């Protein structure tokens, strides 16, 4: 239960940081990867983080009335979701290799 609360807190902090700069996505991925038990969990947490941040970005665009214009810019939505996913998943995966919390496979 404590880990779940911690992960939710990390998601919120990463969202707040990514509102100012894209490095917030990397920092969030690093933190969730560091506290993941294994590689599968690190990848899943990084993917969930990226989808959470991108969903919040889409909600912000919808609030500002710009979502339709953003979605009509053909390659831009695809590039932005792929970059968001890649940054979070790769940073979570790399950090998990050096995490003392990860269970070592023998």
Swiss-Prot record:
Chief localisation class: membrane
GO CC annotations on file: plasma membrane
Annotated localization: Cell membrane
Annotated TM spans: 5-27, 42-64, 76-98
Top-level taxon: Archaea
Topology with respect to the bilayer: Multi-pass membrane protein
Transmembrane is among the record's keywords: yes
This protein's UniProt keywords: Cell membrane, Membrane, Transmembrane, Transmembrane helix
Descriptive protein name: Uncharacterized protein AF_0488
């Amino acid at each position: 239960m404590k880990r779940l609360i911690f992960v939710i807190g990390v998601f919120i902090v990463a969202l707040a940081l990514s509102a100012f700069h894209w490095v917030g996505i990397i920092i969030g991925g690093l933190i969730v990867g560091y506290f993941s038990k294994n590689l599968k969990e690190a990848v899943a947490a990084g993917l969930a983080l990226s989808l959470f941040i991108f969903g919040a970005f889409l909600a912000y665009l919808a609030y500002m009335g710009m979502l339709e214009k953003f979605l009509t810019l053909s390659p831009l939505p695809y590039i932005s979701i792929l970059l968001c996913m890649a940054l979070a998943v790769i940073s979570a995966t790399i950090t998990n290799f050096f995490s003392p919390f990860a269970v070592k496979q023998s």
